[in-house]
Amino acid sequence: MTNTDNMSPNFLRNAFRRLTITAIAPIVMTFEPFFIFPVVLITLARRGFVYILLPITAALILRATKVNYGPLTVSPTMHFNTPSIAVFAVLLVATTIASVFKPKLWRAFLVAIVVISILHAATPIESPVKGEGCNKISIELLDSETNFCFYISSAKTGKMWYYHATLHFMDSEGLVVNRVHLLTAALTFSSEVVEFRNEQGKFHAIFYSEVPIDSLKLKLCYFPETVIGSLPVVFCSSVDLEVR
């Protein structure tokens, strides 16, 4: 391609179209509670109907409580850490450069931006709990050590023992895996299985036993949150506990 070709009206028009799509894609993909399916976005881009996205974006801005440009803007419905923002920012810069000079590479980068935006938009928020009065339970996944607060109380009612167990997120350390999000939790004792119920991020289990319980097995199933958002891959871990 010659310098004359680089400055041709057709080249400039196509470059401007790709730049516009690059800027709009993360915004459209991360509005809450609105969502445009990736196939629709990519189809519009391939057909060159980029200006159709402008009124859609304007309408969403009027209805949304806050504009979320991928992980570059934090809103109450999403949370991001420094590695996530750095990865997204580098990818966004690379996509912007590729939109002018490398159209084929630009398409791949654009898809990556859309995927990251969706994963972050789908990442749940859990309020961490202080460690006071907690029995810390740790699980390890790749480079992450995630700690949960576990507490169990008991009382004797007639001939039965009453137990109330609570479980919720404390803190996490890791670069690739930032934390994990619980899906299910269950306690096993004397061949009995008790499922926790999830109440806004805090897990509770109430059960009875004819004899005092001195040991439990806790099974946790969760999915990891990485620098590109939560991954829909389920992992499970088991922890042996003593009841004092």
Curated annotation (Swiss-Prot):
Topology within the bilayer: Multi-pass membrane protein
Coiled coil segments of this chain: none
Cellular component GO terms held in the UniProt record: plasma membrane
Ranges that cross the membrane: 20-42, 49-67, 82-101, 108-125
Chief location category: membrane
Sorted UniProt keywords: Cell membrane, Membrane, Transmembrane, Transmembrane helix
Compartmental location: Cell membrane
Full protein name: Uncharacterized protein AF_0399
Organism: Archaeoglobus fulgidus (strain ATCC 49558 / DSM 4304 / JCM 9628 / NBRC 100126 / VC-16)
Phylogenetic lineage: Archaea, Methanobacteriati, Methanobacteriota, Archaeoglobi, Archaeoglobales
